Design a protein with these regions (language model features):
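Short, cationic low-complexity segments
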Residues: 132-161, 353, 445-450, 798-823
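Extended, folded cores of ATP/NTP-driven motor/assembly subunits in large transport
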Residues: 1-399
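P-loop NTPase motor core of the ASCE superfamily
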Residues: 100, 516-570, 717-837
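Short glycine/proline-enriched loop/turn "hinge" motifs that connect secondary-structure elements
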Residues: 23-29, 102-107, 317-322, 414-416, ...
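Conserved P-loop NTPase motor cores
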Residues: 427-460, 469-478, 495-503, 637-757, ...
């Protein structure tokens, strides 16, 4: 027969009365203000930043009045990533990526802070006075309104102090967030069901002597409630060995083992009880005297006296406030075997903090009850220990999961801890926030570091979000992706230009469809001609640059006035030879050959004039239509060793991109230059590169340079001054190969010690069950983190640069009549099936 006398309704025991003006009011007249807490991302915080956060908490807590309680509550709930599989607008590769990550498990972390004002009597009561043990609760009236006003003013101060730090942000919770709405449960609903956000439904709660059960979940509670359980020393942070090297440190908060590093459903409660410090110290003085007088009867009394005296000495000499503290880890599972494993895991995590794990079964029910948001004043005093604010704050968690960018635009990377997809905007949102002043990017990664996978992954997502992408490549890295786009758009897009002797790439730098030549267009033509004329180590004088600029302007005036003259390099050469040279001879102020050797210029440029060996290059009669094509690859591997052609082809491709950029208003444009940047890294080209980067920024575009050779950037001042200094986003891949040279890289890129530590942690602790490479992304020296480039099998087969795999894909596509998408789909299924066998 059921014993109904032991059953109570939640309503009769519920300790909270109402939510008034954003404050929770308990039936014992305690006032609580609740906040959501935003912490910095995991693996991105330095020791100095941890100390700054610790200092901010300390300053904020000191403004609270006596008999206040600080209750920080960290929720860690296991969830599965839900892929957007029903989204009909996804591309083939985007859908494959969503399938790959679908149901990927991770820990969802949310942090709450409750500031409670109670009274001396409530703060001193023990577990047998908990509201859980009393009969029907009669609401009490708030008697001292002045104290409430002072507390609310202190809370405002507390909020300002915390929000003045760069690392932490707290936001007051609304009534709807606390108690919920008809459509969605609030925080209180979640606590009584131990469920994830938005899925709360109240469960039966069984509070037994040896077991606490919420619905189907059985709870286990580990507490730090006695100084005997604590380590001898504490600190704000500790070294995380798995991501550290002999040259770099990865830091985590002291409490991180019971945070995200504990892979189970759990709540980590952190309580600080702010009492009357002077009264506490006075009571300890009295205890010390009593212990001294009883010391002759027991050695333990003598030892206790010494401990109390040491506590008092530290308090008085350093001006520290005496407080009480308590910390507990509340974990749960519906499976007994899993719960047994969780108990071991929590115990191990506490042991990593050098704490003595204590599995608490005696006060589990009252501690669970005190953990109700807004009910911290119900905490049993015997479960706390005396300490100071500074050491107690070391037990606060100080980092959280990677966060999605609050932006519609971005790329999908993966969290390096769990592999959960992260939406990351490295272009628009940082510009809007002033983190960066341009969208340009510099990418450095040695061979085999996953550089091509990352760039393929990035440009594919930019393209799918409407960007115009132009790639200058020297290794067929983008052939698979380009072919896939070409096939999908039925030839309308995905254009792949390859330089061959039979079909060389040709251009017309003097062509514009409307005969409009702005200053930038004229400058780019001059830069091109100077590059054709002078070698990298030859100096260009102001007279030479000025005369060539005058010649270009005069020729442009001619073709604008007389449309019968075809704009091309041939007619420019003829104008320079037949008209401009004679005009120079007629001038009153003569220009000598030593100042501007026009004959030398004509001789050097003759090879690009009709009949010369490169006469095809600058005299194209059909202008490449870059305007409507959104994905274009120029593969110029065939000319990368040709010192005459390589710079010219690279410059003219960039010039073609700039022309495209000027005409496409309000549309994102990207030019990515792989190793081809070496062709333009000369002293003569420095101004042009700066001009390109400046122009790109003004037209909603971004220039990206990719390299794999460290020596190239260390030894080239042009790269530093023209490319690196104009790229606010820096992306580095695995640099372990260059560990001994990294100081030079650090100096060249202007990296901080924090950024260096992050970069050297790349791929140090990869999950063997997942196939991915890590990449570091730094934005303007203000934001940086390491992410995982993890792709589906379909994406892998599209991006791969491994010759045998590329041949396999192309052969299968040939068998299917050129259908590369079906070929990739078939091969991906086969490879997944083989892996599972």
């Amino acid at each position: 027969m059921r014993n109904n006398s032991k059953i109570s309704t939640l309503e009769s025991k519920f300790p909270l009365l109402s939510v008034e003006q954003g404050c929770m009011v308990s039936k014992d007249a305690d006032i609580t203000v609740a906040f959501r807490v935003e912490l910095p991302e995991l693996f991105t915080v330095t020791s100095t930043e941890y100390e700054a956060m610790h200092s901010a908490w300390h300053k904020a807590i000191k403004v609270l009045p006596n008999y206040s309680i600080v209750h920080k509550q960290d929720w860690f709930i296991r969830e599965d990533y839900q892929g957007r599989l029903s989204d009909g607008g996804l591309s083939f590769l985007a859908r494959a990526s969503e399938r790959h990550f679908n149901e990927r498990p991770y820990l969802h972390h949310s942090v709450y802070l409750f500031l409670t004002k109670t009274n001396k009597q409530r703060m001193a009561q023990q577990s047998n006075f908990s509201s859980l043990c009393r009969g029907h609760l009669l609401p009490k009236e708030i008697t001292n309104k002045d104290e409430v006003m002072k507390f609310m003013e202190a809370v405002d101060q507390f909020e300002r102090i915390i929000n003045d730090t760069e690392q932490i942000r707290i936001v007051r919770m609304t009534e709807e967030e606390l108690v919920g709405t008809n459509e969605k449960g609030g925080l209180l609903d979640r606590y009584f069901s131990l469920s994830e956000e938005g899925h709360a439904s109240l469960e039966d709660i069984r509070l037994g002597a040896d077991l606490v059960r919420v619905g189907d979940n059985m709870l286990c509670l580990h507490t730090l409630s006695d100084t005997d359980d604590l380590p001898t020393t504490v600190s704000t942070d500790s070294r995380y060995e798995r991501l550290s090297t002999d040259r770099s440190d990865c830091r985590l908060s002291f409490a991180s083992p019971v945070g995200l590093m504990l892979p189970c459903n759990h709540i980590y409660n952190q309580y600080l009880f702010i009492e009357d410090s002077d009264a506490n110290l006075e009571r300890f003085e009295k205890q010390a005297r009593n212990m001294h007088s009883l010391a002759r009867y027991s050695r333990s009394n003598q030892i206790n006296e010494e401990w109390i005296q040491e506590y008092l000495n530290i308090a008085h000499s350093q001006g520290l406030n005496s407080i009480r503290a308590h910390f507990n880890v509340l974990a749960w599972s519906s499976d007994k075997e899993e719960l047994r494993q969780i108990k071991n895991d929590v115990g191990s995590a506490l042991a990593l903090m050098e704490c003595h794990p204590r599995h608490n079964t005696i006060d589990a029910a009252t501690l669970y009850w005190a953990g109700i948001p807004g009910n911290a004043a119900d905490f049993p005093a015997e479960e706390s220990f005396y300490t100071f604010i500074e050491p107690a704050l070391c037990f606060f968690t100080a980092e959280t999961n990677y966060k999605d960018s609050l932006s519609p635009f971005g790329i999908k990377m993966a969290d390096r801890l769990s592999g959960k997809p992260v939406h990351l905007d490295i272009s628009d949102l940082p510009m809007k926030k002033g983190v960066i002043t341009n969208r340009n990017k510099f990418i450095l990664g040695p061979s085999g570091s996953g550089k091509s996978f990352f760039t393929n992954h990035m440009v594919r997502q930019y393209y799918e979000q409407g960007a115009h992408v132009l790639l200058v490549d020297t290794g067929n890295s983008y052939q698979g992706l380009c072919e896939l786009i070409h096939r999908k758009t039925k030839g309308e897009d995905g254009v792949y230009f390859t330089y061959t002797n039979e079909s060389p790439i040709s251009f017309n730098p003097f062509y514009t469809d409307d005969y409009f030549f702005d200053v930038e267009k004229r400058e780019s033509i001059c830069t091109l001609l100077l590059t054709l004329w002078k070698s990298a180590d030859e100096h260009i004088t102001k007279t030479e640059a000025g005369e060539l600029g005058s010649a270009v302007n005069a020729y442009i005036e001619l073709i604008c006035a007389d449309h019968s003259v075809t704009p091309c390099f041939n007619t420019f050469y003829e104008y320079l030879r037949d008209v401009y040279r004679k005009d120079m001879e007629k001038r009153d102020i003569k220009v000598t050959l030593s100042d501007f050797n026009i004959n030398n210029l004509l001789t050097t440029l003759k090879q690009y004039y009709k009949g010369g060996r490169y006469d095809f290059l600058l005299n194209s009669d059909k202008n490449i239509d870059l305007l409507s094509k959104r994905f274009i690859v120029f593969e110029i591997d065939q000319v990368k060793d040709n010192k005459d052609l390589f710079p010219v082809v690279t410059i003219i491709i960039m010039e073609a991109f700039i022309n495209k950029m000027r005409r496409l208003k309000g549309i994102r444009k990207m030019i990515l230059i792989e190793e081809a940047w070496k062709a333009i890294a000369s002293a003569n080209m420095a101004d042009y590169i700066k001009y390109l980067y400046k122009t790109v920024r003004k037209y909603f575009g971004e220039a990206i340079v990719v390299t794999q050779e460290v020596d190239d950037i260390i030894q080239s001042p042009i790269v530093k001054e023209s490319i690196i200094n104009n790229s606010d986003c820096k992306i580095l891949l695995d640099q372990r190969k260059y560990m001994t040279k990294f100081d030079g890289i650090q100096a060249m890129l202007g990296l901080s010690e924090k950024e260096k530590s992050q970069i050297l942690s790349i791929n140090q602790n990869n999950d063997p069950n997942r196939l991915y490479k890590e990449v570091w992304i730094g934005l303007g020296g203000m934001q940086s983190a390491v992410y995982a480039t993890e792709v589906s099998m379909e994406e892998y087969l599209t991006y791969t640069t491994e010759e045998t795999e590329k041949v396999e894909v192309m052969n299968r596509a040939a068998q299917l009549g050129g259908d590369i998408e079906t070929a990739i789909r078939q091969l991906a299924i086969e490879k997944r099936n083989n892996k599972e066998k």
